[in-house]
Each structure stands twice: as structure tokens, then as C-alpha cells.
From Swiss-Prot:
Keywords: Developmental protein, Glycoprotein, Secreted, Signal
Lineage, opening ranks: Eukaryota, Metazoa, Ecdysozoa, Arthropoda, Hexapoda
Positions annotated as glycosylated: N144, N215
Gene3D superfamilies per record: TolB, C-terminal domain (2.120.10.30)
Compartment(s): Secreted
Leader sequence residues: 1-21
Summary of the knockout phenotype: Flies fail to pigment the adult cuticle and larval mouth parts and show reduced level of locomotor activity and male competitive mating ability.
Family according to the record: Belongs to the major royal jelly protein family.
Primary localization: secreted
Protein name: Protein yellow
Length: 541
């Protein structure tokens, strides 16, 4: 009888567990410290003995997915980083702590070999034409230890042949003595030659545009929106208080192509809680670098504790962004006003998501998040007996489900209030991508994690699959009689265990207290719900 009551009690507890306890992001890879795929043990031992490889000095900061490869960047902030641009062969390493393979090879990761190699890479981007865009900062060190053996250079690789097809050095007029560029956004227009890249100069306070077709770049400088907010320079991450008050424009995302044939670039300074926007019609026009001040638009603030370094937008207008103060990933549907009540939290974790450094959406609408505990690495000491670096993944549809970003749960919703100055609508050409830059994108298997045979030499892409990529159906927006109505998803969250802060006008989900019984507490607490992985649950037996 008592056993029956206990079973009933457990059942009731399970039923009333709030939705925030069910992690959506699932851990795919994790490391205590990074390891690299040296050609053999002898060379690895030599690198360790010489100081060319110091495992404790390596920190991953960027991630990108294409086919069966997951790219990871490791900047040369300290000595002993053997490669800065690397990847994981996902066919050979389904999960665990795989060695990082230099891309495209070891020779191309030689520090200081400016014309032939990449010295330091941060954020990278794969475009829909099968090209990998990498900005080499040419730097070694960080802060006061920084040296510049090489100039800033854009490197573009063809992922079907694993060869570099373009290297472009930024001219001196596009940089200044304070320049530090870590972020990149890539804008593909009518075809693969109609491509532009945008670079955020975080400490030089500028935005640089590069045209693939013209092989030329130009700089937008001194706009006040590129500068840090003097009231937002205080940070608290993992129990560490620090000040990054000089950090300007950093995170960027691009909207889908609008009716006028252009996208909207959204951006935020790191020391800021506010988002800004500008049409790529302005950025693509070199003649507008000096007279475009009023073409930039200021949006609302996200709310307290909402610094962000990484953002990405899906092709149906869903923006994801990291919230480094909250150990969380947030969302916003760009058809809604940029107001805090329309911002959601898709996942949060005070252990696994300490500093979610990079967020990406791949060609199959799967989300990838890299967390690296960066402030602990820079300002304190990492515990190398603990897991420090993690890569998570989940379908975009799963992440936004039952949040304000899922318009399937919204009865009302006004159109987007981001007002870009109107221009005459230009006719759009068909999206005809040239064959040499648009390979067929393979679809990841959804029913089995069985290893595929080793790929042939120099070809790491899996065989083409006929799987159909599922899309997120989005209902059309309607405006309620009173104007802005509260979405159903917002009410759903309130009635399913997600509490909201009410300090001021900002409404963000608040983190629930940790349940008793955790192991050691703090960063040493293990996140068993994540480490199990949805692929293990779905494919046992």
C-alpha cells in the first residue's frame, strides 16, 4: 500500500515538473581540455615537449556545421596552440571528446605564414554555396600580449574540394590602431557571386563590408550605435564580476531577403543591452559610408543581464542569441516587435551553458551551441578535472516550442515594428546558384547513429541522402483589437512553471533554484539530463 502511494507521489511530481527542467539542448561533444589529431604519437610528444602544444592554453570560441563536419576555432591567445581552424569528423566521432583535426591541413595552420596559412580565427560562417568564410585576424596573444605578425585577411574555402579559393587582405583604411574583429556575417543575394561579408570591429568601433564580386571592402565608421553603452560595462558570469566597458559592436545576424531584395543586418555592441538594425542596401553601397547615419535604426533593450556576443537568424526569421550573464540562449521572432515581452529563453543551464560563446543554425535547421567558460579561462583558473567545453545541438523547432518565438502558439501578433527607411522595390532575380559553389547539401540521418564507412581521402562529405528537411510552419500574424496582444505562448509559459521577473518593464524567464542533492554544487555539478543525449535514448537496442 505504501509502495503504491509512493508510486503515485512520484507520478504526480513527474506530471507537475515545470518545463524549464526538461533540457532541450542535448550535449553532443565535451572536453576537459582540447586535444588535436597529430599525425602520430611521436610528433605529439615532440610538440608537448617543445611547448608547441600546451593543452591547458586552448579555448574553443567558434563553431559551424556543414555535412558531416563540425568546425571549431581555437584562437592563439596563449602559446601552445597547434591549429586555429579545426573540425570534427562526425562520422568517426559520434559523441565524446574527439581530437580536433586541422582544416584544411596542418600546413595551413602555421602561425605567421601570412600568405599561406591562418594565424588566428574566431567566428566562421558556411554559406549556402558550400563556402567556408574565415577571417584571419593575424594576431597572436590577447589584450596587452597581442602581436600582429599578419594583416587581417578574409579566407574563403570551397568545402567540396577543401581548397582555398580566395584570400583578401583588408587595406589599412579599413582598420585603425584599436581594431579587433572577431565576428562575421555573410550575405548571399541573387547568386553566389552576389555575396557580401560584414565584419564587426569591436574595439575600433566600425563595420566593414566586403564584396565578393568586386573583391573590395569599405568601412562604416564612427556611428554612435557601434560604441559601447557606458552603463552596460559590468558583467557577472560564473560568480566572477568583471568589466568589459570598451567592447563595441560584436554580435550580428542577417534577416531573410525582404521584398526590396535586401536583408536587414541586426547587431549589438557587447557592452550593451540594445539591438540595432540597418538595411544591407546601405552596407552594399560604398558611397554611403559617410552619409548613412539616419539609415541605422535603434531597437528596444532586451532587459537586464542581457549582454550577447553571438546571434543568428533562420531563413524564416527566428533569431537566436546567447545571453552570457544568464547562462542561456534566447530567441526573438522578427515578425514581432523587438520588445522584452516577445523575447524568450529556449534553454538555460548554470553549469553546461556557462558562457555560451557561439550559436549557429545549420542547413537542416539544427542549432549548435558552443559553451566554453571563457571568463573563468581568462580571469581565473579552469578545473581540468571537470568538463569545461561543450557543444550542444537540437532542432530549431524543438528549441522554440512553447515559447513566444513559436508563432504556432500565438493568437495575436503585430507586424514587425523595425522600420527600415523605405526605398523603391527592385525586381529580384531567381536564386540561380552557380554549380561550382553550390553542392547538394547532405541530410543528416535521423533514424540511426551507426557509423558510416571511413570517407575517401580528401573527401569528408557523406553520401547524399534523400531525407526531407522538416520546416517550421508559422501562422500568419493578426493584430488584436487593443493593439499589441499577449501571445498564447507567453500565457502558456506562465502556467507551466516559468516565472517572470517583474522588476521594471522587462519580462524574462528567471532561473529556478537548483534542486538539493547535486554533486558538490557550482561548476562541478554534473548535468546528467544533458549528458545522456537524445540520440542514446532514441537508438538503444
Amino acid at each position: 500500500m505504501f509502495q503504491d502511494k509512493g508510486w503515485i507521489l512520484v507520478t504526480l511530481i513527474t506530471l507537475v515538473t515545470p518545463s524549464w527542467a526538461a533540457y532541450k539542448l542535448q550535449e553532443r561533444y565535451s572536453w576537459s581540455q582540447l586535444d588535436f589529431a597529430f599525425p602520430n604519437t611521436r610528433l605529439k610528444d615532440q610538440a608537448l615537449a617543445s611547448g608547441d602544444y600546451i593543452p591547458q592554453n586552448a579555448l574553443p570560441v567558434g563553431v559551424e556545421h556543414f555535412g558531416n563536419r563540425l568546425f571549431v576555432t581555437v584562437p592563439r591567445w596563449r602559446d601552445g596552440i597547434p591549429a586555429t581552424l579545426t573540425y570534427i569528423n562526425m562520422d568517426r566521432s559520434l559523441t565524446g571528446s574527439p581530437e580536433l583535426i586541422p582544416y584544411p591541413d596542418w600546413r595551413s595552420n602555421t602561425a605567421g605564414d601570412c600568405a599561406n596559412s591562418i594565424t588566428t580565427a574566431y567566428r566562421i560562417k558556411v554559406d549556402e554555396c558550400g563556402r567556408l568564410w574565415v577571417l584571419d585576424t593575424g594576431t597572436v596573444g590577447i589584450g596587452n600580449t597581442t602581436t600582429n605578425p599578419c594583416p587581417y585577411a578574409v579566407n574563403v574555402f570551397d568545402l567540396t574540394t577543401d581548397t582555398r579559393i580566395r584570400r583578401y587582405e583588408l587595406p589599412g583604411v579599413d582598420t585603425n590602431p584599436n581594431t579587433f574583429i572577431a565576428n562575421i556575417a555573410v550575405d548571399i543575394g541573387k547568386n553566389c557571386d552576389d555575396a557580401y561579408a560584414y565584419f564587426a570591429d569591436e574595439l575600433g568601433y566600425g563595420l566593414i563590408a566586403y564584396s565578393w564580386e568586386l573583391n573590395k571592402s569599405w568601412r562604416f565608421s564612427a556611428h554612435s550605435y557601434f560604441f559601447p553603452d557606458p552603463l552596460r560595462g559590468d558583467f557577472n558570469v560564473a560568480g566572477i564580476n568583471f568589466q568589459w566597458g570598451e567592447e563595441g559592436i560584436f554580435g550580428m545576424s542577417l534577416s531573410p531577403i525582404r521584398s526590396d531584395g535586401y536583408r536587414t543586418l541586426y547587431f549589438s555592441p557587447l557592452a550593451s543591452h540594445r539591438q540595432f538594425a540597418v538595411s544591407t542596401r546601405i552596407l552594399r553601397d560604398e558611397t554611403r559610408t559617410e552619409d548613412s547615419y539616419h539609415d541605422f535604426v535603434a531597437l528596444d533593450e532586451r532587459g537586464p543581464n542581457s549582454h550577447t556576443t553571438s546571434r543568428v537568424m533562420s531563413d524564416d526569421g527566428i533569431e537566436l542569441f546567447n545571453l552570457i550573464d544568464q547562462n542561456a540562449v534566447g530567441c526573438w521572432h522578427s515578425s514581432m516587435p523587438y520588445s522584452p515581452q516577445f523575447h524568450g529563453i529556449v534553454d538555460r543551464d548554470d553549469v553546461g551553458l556557462v558562457f555560451p560563446a557561439d550559436v549557429k543554425i545549420d542547413e537542416n535547421k539544427n542549432v549548435w551551441v558552443l559553451s566554453d567558460r571563457m571568463p573563468v579561462f581568462l580571469l581565473s583558473d579552469l578545473d581540468y578535472s571537470d568538463t569545461n567545453f561543450r557543444i550542444y545541438t537540437a532542432p530549431l523547432a524543438t528549441l522554440i516550442e512553447n515559447t513566444v518565438c513559436d508563432l504556432r502558439n500565438n493568437a495575436y501578433g503585430p507586424p514587425n515594428t523595425v522600420s527600415i527607411p523605405k526605398q523603391a522595390v527592385l525586381p529580384m532575380g531567381p536564386p540561380l546558384y552557380t554549380k561550382q559553389y553550390r553542392p547538394v547539401l547532405p541530410q543528416k540521418p535521423q533514424t540511426s547513429w551507426a557509423s558510416s564507412p571511413p570517407p575517401p581521402s580528401r573527401t569528408y562529405l557523406p553520401a547524399n541522402s534523400g531525407n526531407v528537411v522538416s520546416s517550421i510552419s508559422v501562422s500568419t500574424n493578426s493584430v488584436g483589437p487593443a493593439g499589441v496582444e499577449v501571445p498564447k505562448a507567453y500565457i502558456f509559459n506562465q502556467h507551466n512553471g516559468i516565472n517572470y521577473e517583474t522588476s521594471g518593464p522587462h519580462l524574462f524567464p528567471t532561473h529556478q533554484p537548483a534542486q538539493p542533492g547535486g554533486q558538490d554544487g557550482g561548476l562541478k555539478t554534473y548535468v546528467n539530463a544533458r549528458q545522456s543525449g537524445w540520440w542514446h535514448h532514441q537508438h538503444q537496442g
